[in-house]
Amino acid sequence: MNNEMKRSFRIFILKILAVVFVLTMCYFLYAFVYRARTELPTKAVVTNRASAVYTLRGQMQMLSQKEAFSYFAFDGREKEKEYGTYVIPGLKNTRTLLTEKGATQAMCTSMTPQGLAVTEDYVMVSAYCSTQKHNSVIYVIDKETHNFIKEVILPGQPHVGGLAYDPDHKLLWYSSNINGIAQAVSVKMDTIEAYDYDESHLPVDSQQTVSLYGIVRDSFMTFYEGCLYVGCFEKYNESVIARYGIDAEGNLINTMDKELGMNFEMAVPLDYSTISEQVQGIAFYNDKLLISHSFGILPSRLVVYEQSDKRLYVNENSARTYRFPERLEQIVVEGDNLYVMFESCAYAYRVSSVNIVDLSLIHI
């Protein structure tokens, strides 16, 4: 090959690399930036009930490539309704409010699921608008029939990364914030059951709103043995779970302590536990603590720890680790069942996710 041919070949290779680079950048900008900031137009006037991407059969076929996860999710559940799984509603269209215009009705096509709670009668999923135009919501699903019942509109645009159910006082807690201060908000289950979007076109009323001392963000939460556990997501550093006390009425215990730098009442943790980075949810099961880890397009992990007085739940102390599809969010234990939820089915993440997963019920 003479010098001229070598030069032409190098130019050809450089052109191919340039095209590949441009196409890669276009894909990245579309999948990770554009879709997170835009919404699809819609003519719908109600919240959709069907799955956003897969039928149940399609979901099972896709997950069959993940043998361990598929086994946990579907094995032995043939006689259960929809193999024990629940569809996350509202990911195509959700009735909500246009935040800047108060009680103005609106449809959102960019809801992203985050929090998960299971009560005696319902499965509830929280979601926020990825374009930050609409109020956050909670989807209420009938636990027995698996049917979507209604959407409950929340005040403002909290990320609602965590839901927690207090079965003793029949209260649902959700994570929020104001002016950069982490908050926990409770809503009576009676209020949720009575809520009617068509009647009020207003956000649901809360029972208690409490600022949380000692935690930067309330990214996830759970309720266990009369206490509210709240954790903070950190991308690359260890973080904490804070345990807060509840009084006889089901309210978080507030205090005003100027020695702690407070100038208003806040809930102060009873104690802290140390956790590893990238935690999205926690759940207690007998003498074990289950922690979900995920970040971006990397595979998720479900890590099992033995509960310890040292309260040090970092990777090197784990008892067992399971590999899950990407974008695993909150987890909930009820009896011997583990409910897990993924945000990969949201409009903002569908193109950038290899494995798109709806809500699943996994048997421990």
Feature map (PLM): residue ranges:
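Beta-strand-rich domains and repeat architectures in extracellular enzymes and scaffolds
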Residues: 97-133
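Conserved blade-ending motifs and adjacent loop-strand segments that build the rim/top face
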Residues: 311-334
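Short loop/turn segments immediately following beta-strands, especially the blade-tip
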Residues: 187-199, 243-258, 306-312
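Repeated scaffold domains used in trafficking and secretory/extracellular systems
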Residues: 110-115, 157-162, 212-222, 276-281, ...
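Loop/turn-rich, solvent-exposed surfaces of beta-rich toroidal or solenoidal domains
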Residues: 269-307
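Residue-level detector of Asp-centered blade-edge/turn motifs that repeat once per structural unit
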Residues: 118-120, 167-169, 223-225, 284-286, ...
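Surface loop/turn motifs at the tips and blade-to-blade linkers of beta-strand repeat domains
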Residues: 104-108, 152-156, 209-214, 270-275, ...
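Conserved small/polar residues in nucleotide/adenosyl-binding loops
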Residues: 362-364
